[in-house]
From Swiss-Prot:
The keyword Lyase does not apply. InterPro entries: Hexapep (IPR001451), Hexapep_transf_CS (IPR018357), LpxD (IPR007691), Trimer_LpxA-like_sf (IPR011004), UDP_GlcNAc_AcTrfase_non-rep (IPR020573). Signal peptide: none annotated. Belongs to the transferase hexapeptide repeat family. LpxD subfamily. This is UDP-3-O-acylglucosamine N-acyltransferase. GO terms for cellular component: membrane. One of its GO terms (biological process) is lipid A biosynthetic process. One of its GO terms (molecular function) is N-acyltransferase activity. It comes from Pseudomonas entomophila (strain L48). NCBIfam families: lipid_A_lpxD (TIGR01853), PRK00892.1 (NF002060). Pathway: Bacterial outer membrane biogenesis; LPS lipid A biosynthesis. The gene is lpxD. Coiled coil: none annotated.
Length: 351
């Protein structure tokens, strides 16, 4: 499906200053390098400014300072990237769901499904579940007993909600995600692992987004909780009893161990691992592949590990790391000799 809007309509939708003809038709979005006739682009990062003058885009979202001297058509806004985010939904070709329950879906007699909801082929909705207004449940989804899916929720095909999962409004969950699976809880009896029943649930706030193949485990006793506006990328593991504060974002392959609490407005980069039973305060940034082994009590950026370097250099560095203990001992001996000299003693013949 092709969407066509005029430059004037887009300017009105964004509250942007228009530079160019109102009637110019825009049929899609693209990068500065790839845009062609009829497409709108944006300049959000200065490193791409070199592509601005040569871009074939019909118009560009620009800051006022970047629009000065630009000969092409523009929509002038305070934040081009945010403006792009807002209008991207206008050109999204994703098919619209049709209200109703597909004949192949299996819905329990006592489940409540709003008449405006869309239930896809072969979906299963178990006893006591409640599906709110304008919810989309994709093909082959499983909605367990007593689950609640709030108004405007969108579940892609093959999403699994175990029993007693509570989802707020406008939540998006991508394919393969499993919400409410059993937490990893076992007690050791003389070398034998005894399973602990996970009798809590999962609660997701409003406007949460969960990526492909991400798992959010149910709590052992109380619920695992994901706050409002939280964004979880693909292949993330959220263990039982974890608490994630409002508007925190995590990139792919993050692993959060059980009972850890993460504050609001945090950014957790890809591949980060956190041990269990720690607290992370609000407004923390953790760089990629960092291993968080203790609580973080001060806002700011945190990192561990080493950045990429040429292989030969890395091998030399690794070899030096193995020598640190011996080097430390030699340094301590040297410090003792320096102390002897500075305190009035005489250096040895070896010094």
């Amino acid at each position: 499906m092709t969407v066509t809007m005029t430059l004037g309509q887009l300017a009105e939708a964004l509250g942007a200053t228009l530079k160019g003809p109102e009637a110019l038709q825009i049929t899609g979005l693209a990068t500065l390098q790839e845009a062609g006739s009829g497409q709108l682009s944006f300049l959000a990062n200065k490193q791409y400014r070199k592509f601005l003058e040569s871009s074939q885009a019909s118009a560009v979202l620009l800051k006022a300072e970047d629009a000065e001297g630009f000969a092409g058509n523009a929509l002038i806004v305070a934040d081009p990237y945010l403006a792009y985010a807002r209008i991207s939904h206008l050109f999204d070709p994703k098919p619209k769901a049709v209200a109703g329950i597909h004949p192949s879906a299996v819905v329990a007699e006592d489940a409540q499904v709003d008449t405006s909801a869309s239930i896809g082929p072969f979906a299963v909705i178990e006893s006591g579940a409640r599906i709110g207004a304008d919810v989309t449940i994709g093909a082959h989804c499983f909605i367990g007993a007593r689950c609640v899916v709030g108004e405007g929720g969108w579940l892609a095909p093959r999403v699994t909600l175990y029993h007693d999962v509570i989802i707020g409004k406008r939540v998006v969950i991508q394919s393969g995600a499993v919400i409410g699976g059993e937490g990893f809880g076992f007690a050791n009896e003389k070398g034998i692992w005894r399973k602990i029943a996970q009798i809590g649930g999962v609660t997701l706030g409003d406007d949460v987004e969960i990526g492909v193949n991400t798992a959010v485990d149910r709590g052992a006793l109380s619920d695992t909780r994901i706050g409002d506006g939280v964004k979880l990328d693909n292949q993330i593991q959220i263990a039982h009893n974890v608490q994630v504060g409002d508007h925190t974002a995590m990139a792919a392959c993050v692993g959060i161990s059980g009972s850890t609490r993460i504050g609001k407005h945090c950014m957790i980069a890809g591949g980060v691992g956190m041990v269990g039973h720690i607290d992370v305060c609000d407004n923390v940034f953790v760089s990629g592949m960092t291993m968080v082994t203790r609580s973080i009590t001060e806002p700011g950026g945190y990192s561990s590990g080493t950045a990429m370097q040429p292989l030969a250099e890395w091998r030399k560095s690794a070899a030096r790391i193995r020598q640190l203990d011996e080097m430390s001992k030699r340094l301590q001996q040297l410090e003792k000799r320096v102390d002897t000299v500075t305190s009035g003693g005489q250096p040895t013949s070896e010094g």
